[in-house]
Amino acid sequence: MMSHTETSLGAENTRTHNFITQIIDEDLASGKHKSVHTRFPPEPNGYLHIGHAKSICLNFGLAKEYQGLCNLRFDDTNPVKEDVEYVDSIKADVEWLGFKWEGEPRYASDYFDALYGYAVELIKKGLAYVDELSPDEMREYRGTLTEPGKNSPYRDRTIEENLALFEKMKNGEFAEGKASLRAKIDMASPFMVMREPVIYRIKFSSHHQTGDKWCIYPMYDFTHCISDAIERITHSICTLEFQDNRRLYDWVLENISIERPLPHQYEFSRLNLEGTLTSKRKLLKLVNDEIVDGWNDPRMPTISGLRRRGYTPASLREFCRRIGVTKQDNVVEYSALEACIREDLNENAPRAMAVIDPVRVVIENFESEAVLTAPNHPNRPELGERQLPFTKELYIDRADFREEANKQYKRLVLGKEVRLRNAYVIKAERVEKDANGEITTIFCTYDPETLGKNPADGRKVKGVIHWVSAVNNHPAEFRLYDRLFTVPNPGAEDDIESVLNPNSLVIKQGFVEQSLANAEAEKGYQFEREGYFCADSKDSRPEHLVFNLTVSLKEGF
């Protein structure tokens, strides 16, 4: 596993070096290409996840680095699973990450007429045929990794027959599954992808871009390479599972009349992040079964989920930079992702105080009300100061008080002193409990001479705890998020529900300081001694503040 022993954020603009940049450098030096043109080609059948962020940063990053172009293209060849909701979310995610595509977004469906023409060209060259094997029969004829496939009985139809049948497919004269157009290559090929794959199938489904114009749709492997060539993509970059598909990519382009030079496909290792799931099918099941609160649930590995959790674009870009681009599959520790957001927020997030599990404190010798000031960031004076109302009654966190404690406990103990953050030293004098023995109130005294300085008599007060006024505050809901799964590789589990973490969300009710009344959604704060939080973009509002835990203050805290 890759650890996160890295330098802090800020290396975004340094020159990257990997096997792809080496290829590009050679291509530009040799004159093979005069410029760089990449693309990010998601299928709009789900929300983008952290793995897509790596691909986005790579493709858009290369275009930026080489002063080239990067297209956003939707590979929308399966109308059954696709939706405009996903199109819109993908555009929003790419822009939020800080990237802008070349021109308007493109769609593979923009090229359906051209793709149909290229399919006809293959038929005329004797390189494609209409097959009427059922899907089950086709699987049976395909063979195995150790046995060659068998030719379809429909393989030797004449060009004229195939042209007429393909026209019938286009006109809706075949039912779904009753006919398909296949590439005519080699059923004995050692590469399964080359055993005469289907390149067009019938689907009587309305398409989100083309409506009901088509009832035949091209397959991904046929569409993708031609779309790259139409758009004059120079370097078509995808993940390693498409390595064998490159043979079909090249075969299609070499056998049609399309402008040269042809694009070339390069593969890199996909992101495998410890403890997360990136299968769209399994993520969709979590959403549909209401195990999570939609695609943007803060526990989801989606870009929109990470955004709602409080991750920043800079932290995700930095994470992608650190993990790099290789051809070797590896698993990245989740702590590497957390380190990036923790460093970002430590440097940039304003500080505030929040009491998540409150217990009441009464300062018996404090009769007035004071307004104290505190810096918004200890190392960033330009971020200014905030006012903290200090009142007779306060809230502190229940975990910050004990009636008895050993010397290692540096918080408030009965009969002993502690400093309140940005305020005075107080001493716990006595407690009040309810019928169940639960402490309801801690009665204290304060030392008025200790605001911003140590006690005059030299006594040592070692602990510091945070607090919120019990009078001037805002009630808040705190959503304490943890990992969604209890195992490092949930994708390998047949039943993902069996490895769900029952404590992936714990909800607490407490209070935040007055300055957070209008906390901006998704803006990160360090709640001192608690963690990094942000206001929830979906549920938080001034009359009902909701804060999401983004990440703990320290690794493994």
From Swiss-Prot:
Top-level EC class as recorded in UniProt: ligase
CDD domains for the chain: GlnRS_core
Ranges spanned by the short sequence motif 'HIGH' region, renumbered to the chain: 42-52
Main location: cytoplasm
A GO biological-process term: glutamyl-tRNA aminoacylation
Molecular function terms from GO: ATP binding; glutamine-tRNA ligase activity
Catalytic activity: tRNA(Gln) + L-glutamine + ATP = L-glutaminyl-tRNA(Gln) + AMP + diphosphate
UniProt subcellular location: Cytoplasm
Keyword hit for Phosphoprotein: no
Segments traversing the membrane: none
Sorted UniProt keywords: Aminoacyl-tRNA synthetase, ATP-binding, Cytoplasm, Ligase, Nucleotide-binding, Protein biosynthesis
Gene3D superfamilies in alphabetical order: Glutamyl-trna Synthetase, Domain 2, Glutamyl-tRNA Synthetase, Domain 3, HUPs, Ribosomal Protein L25, Chain P
Top-level lineage group: Bacteria
InterPro entries assigned to the protein according to its UniProt record, in alphabetical order: aa-tRNA-synth_I_CS, Gln-tRNA-synth, Gln/Glu-tRNA_Ligase, Gln_tRNA_ligase_bac, Glu/Gln-tRNA-synth, Glu/Gln-tRNA-synth_Ib_cat-dom, Glu/Gln-tRNA-synth_Ib_codon-bd, Glu_tRNA_lig_a-bdl
Positions that bind ATP: E43, P44, N45, H49, I50, G51, H52, A53, K54, S55, T239, R270, L271
Binding site for L-glutamine: D75, Y220
Sequence motif 'KMSKS' region, residues: 277-281
A GO cellular-component term linked to this record: cytosol
EC numbers on record: 6.1.1.18
Family: Belongs to the class-I aminoacyl-tRNA synthetase family.
Oligomeric form and interacting partners: Monomer.
Cross-referenced PANTHER family: GLUTAMATE--TRNA LIGASE (PTHR43097:SF5), GLUTAMINE-TRNA LIGASE (PTHR43097)
The name this protein goes by in its record: Glutamine--tRNA ligase
Native species: Haemophilus influenzae (strain ATCC 51907 / DSM 11121 / KW20 / Rd)
Organism lineage: Bacteria, Pseudomonadati, Pseudomonadota, Gammaproteobacteria, Pasteurellales
